[in-house]
């Protein structure tokens, strides 16, 4: 060491070696420090993701519990409305409301197509006061089935009903009289509703009289038609931004609905 210190050139070389060693040690420390930070960030992100997923599951458990309570309190089973129809309707209604997509949140309409068309299978529910405002007949598309609807489509000219969630829009007077436009918001299942001219309208072939005479309810080109005399009662209540749901226990729909699974 003394030899190095007495020789300026060797002293400089020693200094360079020492600085390089310190630099390498420091660089290694920085590397290990950065690696630790990255691992911590990944861990924190995973923890946050799990927490968010659990919070969402807890939220859905609460929504389902609320639906179960309302279903029981309103004795909806006695009215023929299936538990699954109401539960899914409530979940979708909740999600659409949470996203701010519903202008009118005090009304929820459910068409339970798991029932026979000769049943009064359309329910207009007062959400706030938890009571059924109207229960009436509703027709399905001619190519969806006869007494029971069991085939559904979003395709043009299919003449089939489309499953899923809709948001009601404006009224108009057309060939079927006082009618209501609806917008399908379930991607791939009913989002062609406007193009297909799917609306709520009255029809004289939707009545018990028709069932008694012909043995089955009349059908449509895909519209959820109701008795003509009910249009002036129901349409003003549900128009302009309320949730309208057409249900059937389709495994594909329930698994892929963009509303239910959002």
What are these regions (language model features)?
Residues 35-220, 228-236, 242, 251-253, ...:
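Cell wall/extracellular polymer interaction/catalysis modules
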Residues 248:
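Active-site proximal loops enriched in glycine and acidic residues that flank catalytic Cys/His/Asp
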Residues 225:
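Short aromatic/basic micro-patch
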Residues 1-37:
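Bacterial Sec-dependent N-terminal signal peptides
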């Amino acid at each position: 060491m003394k030899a190095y210190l007495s020789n300026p050139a060797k002293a400089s070389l020693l200094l360079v070696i020492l600085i390089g060693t310190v630099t390498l040690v420091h660089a290694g420390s920085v590397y290990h420090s950065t690696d630790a930070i990255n691992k911590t960030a990944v861990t924190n992100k995973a923890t946050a993701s799990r927490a968010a997923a659990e919070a969402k599951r807890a939220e859905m458990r609460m929504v389902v519990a609320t639906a179960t309570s309302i279903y029981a309190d309103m004795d909806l089973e006695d009215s023929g409305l299936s538990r699954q129809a109401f539960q899914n309707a409530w979940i979708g209604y909740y999600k659409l409301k949470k996203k701010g997509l519903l202008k009118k949140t005090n009304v929820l309409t459910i068409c339970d197509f798991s029932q026979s068309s000769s049943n009064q299978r359309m329910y207009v529910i007062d959400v706030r006061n938890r009571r059924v405002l109207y229960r009436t007949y509703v027709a399905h598309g001619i190519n969806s089935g006869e007494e029971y609807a069991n085939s559904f489509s979003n395709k043009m000219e299919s003449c089939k009903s489309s499953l899923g969630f809709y948001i009601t829009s404006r009224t108009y007077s057309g060939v079927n009289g006082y009618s209501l436009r609806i917008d399908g918001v379930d991607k791939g299942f009913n989002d062609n509703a406007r193009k297909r001219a799917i609306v709520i309208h009255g029809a004289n072939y939707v009545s018990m009289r028709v069932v008694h005479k012909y043995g089955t309810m009349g059908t449509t080109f895909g519209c959820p038609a109701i008795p003509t005399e009910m249009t002036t009662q129901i349409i003003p209540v549900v128009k302009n931004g309320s949730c309208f749901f057409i249900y059937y226990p389709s495994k594909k729909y329930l698994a892929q609905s963009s509303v239910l699974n959002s």
